[in-house]
Amino acid sequence: MDSLFEGVYSALVTPMTVDEEVDYQTLGEFANYLIEEGGLQGLIPLGSTGEYYALSDQEREAVVKTTLAATAGRVPVLVGTNGGSTRQIIAYSRQAETLGAAGLLLAAPYYSLPTPDELYRHFKRINDAVGIPIMLYNYPGRTGVDMKPDLIERLAELDNIQYVKESTGDATRVSEIIRRCGEQIKVFCGCDTLALESFMMGAVGWVGGVVNALPKAHVRLFELAVDNKDFMAARKLYYKLLPVLSLMEGAGQYTQFVKAACAMNGHPVGPPRRPLCAVGDEEASHLKKILASFDMAVSGV
């Protein structure tokens, strides 16, 4: 299978005003920035970092329309169409396809904790309901369900399920999925602190939230590791980037820190929507120091 999707994709933030209304103008401008200046190969609105769970159906549709309009076909837009039931997710997925999405990002339904067999039937129904590629999103830390390699192998037999974003944090998963599935499914790194390891094991892409704040560094790391196979140079850059990635993943406030980092790097995207809150002064000060250290470490590189 030739890969339609590869490279660095943003798990796109959803900009908000100070009143926690979706800021569609900033969303369009930010999407354009990520493509034109950041050099990203794709965008994914309505993922975890995009706070899809906090948006109304009308807002979700408007976010997709705004992102597609801003992108104007320059890069693929995969839309997160997650929800609580198969019926609801099919409706979101069909809507995204109709609006012009290039693909879908699908996690396990939240809260209900379906079994592997129930998950297979769930994803098969979605697969049969749409005609665009599906990227599975395995993030048991958020869904409570781990889509293990044997289930991924079964799902890879379905026509539209062609990718998986692997976010377990298990360093063996990328190689195990590739060993089992071969060319039937392509793996995207979904755990920032295992990015280089994932690329060395055969991942063809990277979906990240921190990429919103540091797009050029992410793209450069991917180029060094995947395009150039220059793992020595990639490792040097990766070790400089790791303190930022580790802080974001380990703080327990991922979306909050990503939005704060965007503002610190000159692209304010507003606060998260409650119940999430903007980071406090102490956290913001620490984040600012980490970002400044990274800037100094890569200056001139």
Could you say what each language-model-derived stretch is?
Residues 4-14, 33-40, 200-203, 210-301:
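C-terminal alpha-helical cap/extension of soluble enzyme domains
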Residues 27, 60, 64, 89, ...:
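A general structural signal for well-ordered alpha-helical segments in protein cores
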Residues 128, 142-249:
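Catalytic alpha/beta core domains of metabolic enzymes, predominantly
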Residues 93, 124, 195, 259, ...:
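Short glycine-/small-residue-rich flexible loop motifs, especially phosphate/cofactor-binding loops
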Residues 62, 66-71, 95, 99, ...:
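Alpha-helical structural signal in soluble globular domains
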Residues 14-18, 54-55, 113, 141, ...:
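Generic structural "secondary-structure junction" signal
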Residues 2-146:
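Active-site beta->alpha loop and helix N-cap motifs at the rims of alpha/beta catalytic domains
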